[in-house]
Amino acid sequence: MRKIASIVEMQRLATQWRRRGIKISFVPTMGYLHDGHLSLVREALKRVGRNGKVVVSIYVNPTQFGPMEDFSKYPRDLKRDLKLCAEAGVDVAFCPGDAEMYPSGGKRSVASPYQSRGTDEAVPSTGFSTYVVEERLSQLMEGASRPTHFRGVTTVVAKLFNLVQPDVAVFG
């Protein structure tokens, strides 16, 4: 199994696979893998067959945490996650850092959604002002109490899809 942290390297590899007609299955995660994640990997392997490739992303996305949500305490164990991925037959563990995914240097955005609320930002600011927003479903259930959560999720998933270019994505 190969660990990739660079967006450019992930894009190059995905492009090589696609040019050779290799199917790519993708399992996006925030790491700290468990049996549920591994069942998603097994499904991903089935979906592309033995000639396909499986990419698992391991990235704790700061944009899906709101104020007063403890981004810094989200559990992480990359060494264990990589071992589990290798044992499960994953081809690539894509593990970008925040500087790769949001390369703004951590500058606070003038349009920060937290500034208007008068709260302190509990997660690293990305400095970005462009996001992918789903306006109907994100207002229900968890979205009702976490107003920026799904904006962060939809944005990072769109970015990951553009990088990995999967034929299949498996979510749990």
Where do the PLM segments sit?
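Nucleotidyltransferase catalytic core that binds NTPs
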Residues: 1-172
